[in-house]
Structure formats: structure tokens, C-alpha cells
Amino acid sequence: MARRRKQLPETPEPASIETLSHDGRGIARRDGKTTFIDNALPGEEVMFKFTYMRRKFDEGKAVEIVTASPDRVTPPCEHSTLCGGCSLQHMSPEVQVSRKQAVLREQLAHFGGLEPEEWLAPLTGPVTGYRSKARMGVKYVEAKGETLVGFREKRNSFIAQLHTCEVLIPDVGHRIDELRTLMHGLESRSRIPQIELAAGDDDVALIIRHLDPLSEADQQALLGFCQNLGWHCYLQPGNESTVHRIWPQEGEQRLYYKHPSAGVELAFHPTDFTQVNAEINRKMVPLALDLLDISPDHTVLDLFCGLGNFTIPAAKRAGKVVGVEVSQAMVERGYENARRNSLENLEFHAWDLSQDVSGQAWARQTYDRILIDPPRTGALEMVKLMPRLGASKIVYVSCNPATLARDAGELMALGYRLKAAGVMDMFPHTTHVESIAVFEKMKKK
């Protein structure tokens, strides 16, 4: 027999918030038990309602702020307490960045007491209208006769009913009502689980994931919507390989973005991985290359290179750049971008960097500089090879401070010093910590 969930108290309870959890919730301790409370900041006195009561901890949501923290601000989005896309809109952006710096510092200290010789100034940009890619759920609710379009609600799998999204670029974030009207008017509305939007510097693409073939009427409705806005229109009847554009039928098949500091332009397919914060990306790439201190006679290795976000700009500074990425499609995109920018001093290789690389020709060469931009799991296997690859300077771009700290400890043990580190606010209003670190080979005495 399934255990019945304990009935939750209806009356709000008081709580004193002591600190913040890793996912942005306030932490209170009541009668020896920890309670995680949404929409609450350290130092605040709040009234909250329980959302879950468990044996070891409870969860709740603040319904009244009795004593507010000086760090509290009015959220820029009306849906901030419902939508799970953001977790820190009620905290000032400056304090958000300070908190991310503290998380990076704590993680480095936790793994072997690491401390960089220099803390880099945080890289910051716009805190609204910054996100250029999004995947949104679509749900037709027959009982209510309505269609939902949005992100998941906080702490559950329901789709939040949104009108706007203030972190998406305005051309997308202020059209969610229009997208919902479009989806609701389709004959196939119950067979469309999600839509995806991606923007380049000048164009927006809308991708419709559909489980059944679309009728001619539905296709015409989608075409009319996209043509009216000048958006590219894509359909996805199956897995990612089935994505295809139905409008415009002629012309450029890619979106693109520019790196003005390098004078280059990178093309991408809407489903390709790209950094979602264009402004921070435009600052991050030249920062990383400046920290690498590349000379025209240098050979540079770019690991986890993707479509060439760092590789292509680096080729404008270096004698030769080698990029390695697991996806053959991304390798082809890298070469496409090299041709697009009339660069011939590059080569790309497809290989899973979590696997043995000893049989790879590129791994038997030596390099002057190495850039690493791994996934959340880090790059421990590649880090162990750094002495053999020979670079005197390494720049490591990380989306997970815990694996950065782990890999930093390994690099220190292999004879590198942690020259500098800092955070980049790639995802304002979230707890996600993007960071960058510089390692230099220690000179033998």
C-alpha cells in the first residue's frame, strides 16, 4: 500500500533565514529540523507555508517578508515566484555576483585549500533580455480548454502559464502570449510537447517538435506566424536529426553571431550548442585569449571546442590552432566557420575526450597554449595529460566550480600554479556559476 502524504498545515509559520542553499533557497532551522524556503534571503524574517514535509527536512515558500534583507529587490519578472527558470530574481544582481564569487572561492578551498594568486574582476552584462536560446514546454489542457507555453514551475513538472519572460531577448520573451495563441489554434496542439527558440545577431528561429504529422492548415499557420515576424521556421518530427527548415526555403541556412573583438563571424544551426548570453560571450572570448597571451608563433589546442567559439578568434592571433570536439557535426561546423572567415591555420578533430587519446595524432603533438571548456563533468582525463602536451599556460573555462576545483587540484599536483580565477555572470538570476581560471607551469628550480 502506498504511504499517504502527510497533510500540510494551512496556517503560515514564522522562520528566520540563516543562509542560502546551493539552489537559491533560504535555509531555516526550526526545532532542530532544516527547512528550505523559496523566495527567502539570509537575514530575513518570513512567514512561509509548507510545500513538502519530509522525515529529515521540510520545504516551503515565503508568503510574507516580515523583515526584508537589504539585498532584496523587486523581481523584474511577474512570474518569478512561479516559474522555475530563475531562482534569484528577488536578490540584487550585485549580490548575486558576489555570492557566485563566494561559491567559487569555497569550492577551490574545499579541494585542497586552493587559492588563486589573483582574483579576476567579475565579468558582468545585462541582467534582463540576455538569453538567446530557450526550450519551452507546450501543454494542451483539455479540461480547461487552454494551452500552456512556458518553463516548468518551481519544484514540479507542471508548465508555468507565462505571459512574458524578462530574461529572454525581448523579441522572444515579449511574445509568449502570441506563441501560446499560435499553439492553441493548431489542430495538433495536443501533439506538440515543446518548442525551441534560438537567436543569432539578426535572426530568430522557431523549432516545433511534433509527435504526429502536421496538417496543411497547421503548417500554413506556422508559416504565417514566422513570416509575419521574419523568423526562420523549423519542424522536428523525430529526434534532433529530423529538424528541417520550411521557411525561408532559400538563402542562408544558418544563424550567425559575431565576435567584434576578433573581426570574425560564426554560423550555427539553431540546435547547435552556443552560449546563451551573447553579451557575456563577446566579453568572455577575448578575455580568455588575452589570459592565454597568444603570440603569432604559438600553436594552440582548444579542447571541447564546439563549433569554434574560441578556436576561430584564437586563429586570428596564433600560428596554428587545433580544435577537438566529440561531435563530427561540430567538427564540420568548425571547418565551415574557418572557411567563412578565410582562415587556413586551423584543424579540427572529432574525439570523445573522456576516452583514451593516446592513438590520436593531435595528442602526440606539443602545444604552447591550451584552452579547455568542458561540460559539467569537467576534464580530469585530459588534465592528467597536460604535462605531456607541454603547454606553459592553460585557460580553463568552467560551468561547474566543483569539477573546476577538482581539476585545478590535479593541475597543481602536476606542476602548474593557479595564477588567476574569476566568475562570469553568464546566467543572471540563477545559481549557475560560470568561471575562468589560468594555470601556468611552474619553473623548475
UniProtKB/Swiss-Prot annotation:
Report the catalytic activity: uridine(1939) in 23S rRNA + S-adenosyl-L-methionine = 5-methyluridine(1939) in 23S rRNA + S-adenosyl-L-homocysteine + H(+)
| KW Cell division (keyword) present | no
Tell me the InterPro entries matching this sequence: 23S_rRNA_MeTrfase_RlmD, MeTrfase_TrmA_AS, MeTrfase_TrmA_CS, NA-bd_OB-fold, SAM-dependent_MTases_sf, TRAM_dom, U5_MeTrfase_fam
Tree of life domain: Bacteria
Q: Which residues bind S-adenosyl-L-methionine?
A: Q275, F304, N309, E325, D352, D373
Keyword vocabulary terms for this entry: 4Fe-4S, Iron, Iron-sulfur, Metal-binding, Methyltransferase, rRNA processing, S-adenosyl-L-methionine, Transferase
Please give the biological process terms from Gene Ontology that the record holds.
rRNA base methylation
Provide the residue positions that the database annotates as binding [4Fe-4S] cluster: C77, C83, C86, C165
Tell me where in this chain the TRAM domain is found.
5-64
Which family does the record claim for this protein? Belongs to the class I-like SAM-binding methyltransferase superfamily. RNA M5U methyltransferase family. RlmD subfamily.
- The protein depicted here goes by the name 23S rRNA (uracil(1939)-C(5))-methyltransferase RlmD
Q: Which organism is it from?
A: Alcanivorax borkumensis (strain ATCC 700651 / DSM 11573 / NCIMB 13689 / SK2)
Provide the taxonomic classification: Bacteria, Pseudomonadati, Pseudomonadota, Gammaproteobacteria, Oceanospirillales
